[in-house]
Amino acid sequence: MTEQSAKLTWGEKTVDLPVKTGTIGPSVIDIGALYKNTSTFTYDPGFTSTASCESSITFIDGDEGVLLHRGYPIEQLAEHGDFLEVCYLLLYGELPTAAQKKDFDYRVVHHTMVHEQMSRFFTGFRRDAHPMAVMCGCVGALSAFYHDSTDITDPHQRMVASLRMIAKMPTLAAMAYKYHIGQPFVYPKNDLDYASNFLRMCFAVPCEEYVVNPVLARAMDRIFILHADHEQNASTSTVRLAGSSGANPFACIAAGIACLWGPAHGGANEAALNMLTEIGTVDRIPEYIARAKDKNDPFRLMGFGHRVYKNYDPRAKIMQKTAHEVLGELGIKDDPLLDIAIELERIALTDDYFIEKKLYPNVDFYSGITLKALGFPTTMFTVLFALARTVGWIAQWNEMIEDPDQRIGRPRHVYTGAPLREYVPVSKR
């Protein structure tokens, strides 16, 4: 990073602050020493103008609709790569050679099984428990079963924990689904690829032969790639903040899952699907467009707009193509939800109201339709998001551990409570 400087003036005080520039992207004013030198700190609710760290993993240009992983466009990775190749890239910084990929795939496969006692752990949950509640508990409990990989100061243990998390998340997610619907658990089959293995664990039953459809497996793999990492979002920041205290990796990922469960974060694809269902038919779209424009109407178009993107989410285009491939393979030619989605997207992209407000389709707009077609209930949508995002969380966590500038996270607040006052005994109040 090359350094320039900026002046901050308030009252009679003026300080020079270093300005840093990354490889690409906007310049950043470094205020790390501001409080130490001036007893003043900044106010930024939601951290919308704050960089909490340096990172070489993911770059987003929201104005241009660009998403890069280690410099590679998401479009190229989703079109030509597979999920484990992207995992290797996020973890190690480069795409693997053929030999490296073979070795990495083998090491992940080696860890797909979970401790047999985990199956009994599941029975402590109600059958109607939300799968995300189950995932929070089970992932957090992994440190009790795999305590030989919780020393964060040991690079080897961190590597083992990383592989275990990537390998075991599909198994745990499938177990959560099977437990939820009352079917027996299906063990992983390690001669299958990552996505095929997951689909088999979800949808196979002991009494029937299950053959994974390669088109559906490829779609599942692409969905995993599209959700693998997305810079310093709420759940990733949660993982980093938890990790800054020295917490073990399983606890940090469980914290990320809990944050992702929030409807404003991981639940957006479910909300988008519910919205399409509510609209019902194409001829009702104008009614809902009008409602979306009405400030006094609580209705909001879900799957449009993004906290970062002020252009078309690059993942949305890939997700739209994937949705068509899945529906075509399954022979679903007249899906009313897809018809509504296509027409709604067309109107939104040509309507001045949405263009001016930069409300473009995001990745959640088509992912709900695709996951529904694959056979997943809406309660599993966020679980699949967590499964895919685990590698991003792990890569970000590892980067934080290795960063010499990182310390325990400690945001400040602007105190607006009562000033100093004296305690009054209860008998005199």
Curated annotation (Swiss-Prot):
Its EC number is 2.3.3.16. Transmembrane segments: none annotated. It comes from the Bacteria. CDD domains: EcCS_like (cd06114). Pathway: Carbohydrate metabolism; tricarboxylic acid cycle; isocitrate from oxaloacetate: step 1/2. The keyword Transferase applies. It is an enzyme of class 2 (transferase). GO terms for cellular component: cytoplasm. GO terms for molecular function: citrate (Si)-synthase activity. SUPFAM superfamilies: Citrate synthase (SSF48256). Gene3D superfamilies: 2.20.28.60, Citrate Synthase, domain 1 (1.10.580.10), Cytochrome P450-Terp, domain 2 (1.10.230.10). It catalyses: oxaloacetate + acetyl-CoA + H2O = citrate + CoA + H(+). Keywords: Transferase, Tricarboxylic acid cycle. The active site is at 306, 364. PROSITE patterns: CITRATE_SYNTHASE. GO terms for biological process: tricarboxylic acid cycle. It holds the Pfam family Citrate_synt. InterPro entries: Citrate_synth-like_lrg_a-sub (IPR016142), Citrate_synth-like_sm_a-sub (IPR016143), Citrate_synthase (IPR002020), Citrate_synthase_AS (IPR019810), Citrate_synthase_bac-typ (IPR024176), Citrate_synthase_sf (IPR036969), Citrate_synthase_typ-I (IPR010953). Belongs to the citrate synthase family. This is Citrate synthase, chromosomal. It comes from Rhizobium tropici. The gene is ccsA.
